[in-house]
Amino acid sequence: MNNVLIITGPTASGKSKISIKIAQDNNGVIINCDSKQIYKEIPIITDQPKLNETFIPHKLYGYVSAVKQYSVAEWVNDLKREIYQTFAENKLPIITGGSGMYISSIIYGLSQIPVIDDNIRYQTKQLFNTLGNKEFYSLLIEKDPMAKRLHCNNSYQLLRAYEVIEQTGTSIFRLQEELKRKPLFDNFILCILVPQKQEVYKKINDRFISMINSSVIEEVKNLISLNIPNHFPAMKAHGIPEIIQYLTNKISIEKAIEIAQRNTRHYAKRQYTWFKNQFPNALFYESQDQLLKFISKKFK
């Protein structure tokens, strides 16, 4: 039976590096499951692999325009196409990235929640813009107490939960429990890389400085020139809001760096908790060496 290998973990945990090593040793193809690395206009700030520096096949990187609101369902369709093509070539698909919604769609399947009316989607967004995160979160909790499990700063999930309760009258979490879902693939192996937090935090800080020292400012300038609405997914990539604040003379570059580093560290911290809670049966590895040893035994 063909295996599907999934390598995930917090941002800056070394997923990309170890995936390349695994692909080299096992005739693999790396397939992206990072929801921001899909966008072709922002390769630097999303730390996309430099495909001209490796002979390992990489799929689903930098192939969607930032002007598009690309859905999880669309990604799943693209993923399945790449997986089956990889099987046809007798290669090992290595799904790599840290986007929780993408990983969940593989492990638990896509939600069968009804499509939201455009009018409800628009009204929800307008309400969110008027109230702001905290007041909108409080209103959501009144309508859907089960939404307390959401983080008040995760605007995407707050909007989604509100849209669903408005559309269906039922909590998104209740619907997820009641509507039958199944994994995309029965033969997946889920490995989660969880290095020491301080090691990851240092990499986050260093990586952002490296981006600033490259041409990331110019990259964000070009993104701004596209006049993309702020709520579009690409505009929320880590570091972009802070650099935009700098470019609009609201904060200094030093402050932009400080805030972006802090926000990304906080995101990584939440990822540690989220992965452990969502995927308790996954294989967790603190070091790349531990993971490589497992892979070498599994596929020898």
Swiss-Prot record:
Class in the EC hierarchy, top level: transferase
Chain positions of site Interaction with substrate tRNA: 99, 121
Transmembrane region(s): none
Keyword entries, A-Z: ATP-binding, Magnesium, Nucleotide-binding, Transferase, tRNA processing
Binding site residues for substrate: 11-16
Signal peptide start and end residues: none
Top-level taxon in the UniProt lineage: Bacteria
EC identifiers of the protein: 2.5.1.75
Region (Interaction with substrate tRNA): 34-37
Quaternary assembly: Monomer.
Annotated family: Belongs to the IPP transferase family.
Identification of the protein by name: tRNA dimethylallyltransferase
Source species of the chain: Ehrlichia ruminantium (strain Gardel)
